[in-house]
């Protein structure tokens, strides 16, 4: 027997594993929540359809939950790995296929993650270049006394 999302939200609204209260602000640590708002609309664990944008290494991972196979977790989630330089509109269209109301939030998040990954790539290259120039002198080893 399945319950409506309204009933489930009433039960978990005040107390949940994903609810984090910080200075009077309610945030969410739900893995399917794109912007950490503690609202019914953004609660991915409640909704049958959800989408989230994350990073996987130096690429962007879009995971969607389509709600067709609710009792089969393996086939319920679809994952698409995209390059960091992918346009935000591609991510937006992938999310809009499942949840059109979350498309703009997902594209914003993808844009921010892509810029972060690009910055990290530049920092790594600069560190590698600096470290290749450094040569370490071997210390003179004093002979052992007998």
Curated annotation (Swiss-Prot):
User: Looking at the Swiss-Prot or TrEMBL record, what is one Pfam family this protein matches?
Assistant: Ribosomal_L28e
List the keywords (alphabetical): Ribonucleoprotein, Ribosomal protein
What cellular component terms from Gene Ontology apply here? ribonucleoprotein complex; ribosome
Q: Which Gene3D superfamilies match?
A: 3.30.390.110
List GO BP terms, alphabetically.
translation
Any one GO MF term held by the record is: structural constituent of ribosome
Task: List the PANTHER family hit by this protein, alphabetically.
Answer: 60S RIBOSOMAL PROTEIN L28
Q: What family does the database annotate? A: Belongs to the eukaryotic ribosomal protein eL28 family.
The protein in question is named Large ribosomal subunit protein eL28
What are the top taxonomic ranks of the organism? Eukaryota, Discoba, Euglenozoa, Kinetoplastea, Metakinetoplastina
């Amino acid at each position: 027997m399945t319950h409506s999302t309204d009933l489930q939200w009433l039960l978990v609204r005040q107390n949940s594993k994903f609810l984090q209260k910080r200075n009077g602000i309610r945030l969410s640590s739900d893995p399917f929540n794109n912007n950490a708002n503690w609202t019914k609309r953004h609660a991915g664990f409640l909704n049958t359809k959800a989408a989230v944008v994350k990073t996987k290494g130096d690429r962007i991972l879009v995971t969607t939950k389509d709600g067709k196979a609710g009792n089969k977790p393996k086939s319920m989630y679809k994952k698409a790995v995209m390059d960091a330089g992918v346009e935000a509109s591609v991510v937006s269209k992938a999310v809009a296929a499942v949840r059109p109301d979350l498309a703009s939030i997902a594209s914003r998040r993808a844009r921010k993650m892509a810029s972060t990954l690009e910055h990290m790539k530049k920092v790594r290259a600069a560190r590698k270049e600096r470290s290749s120039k450094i040569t370490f002198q071997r210390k003179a080893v004093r002979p052992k006394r007998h």
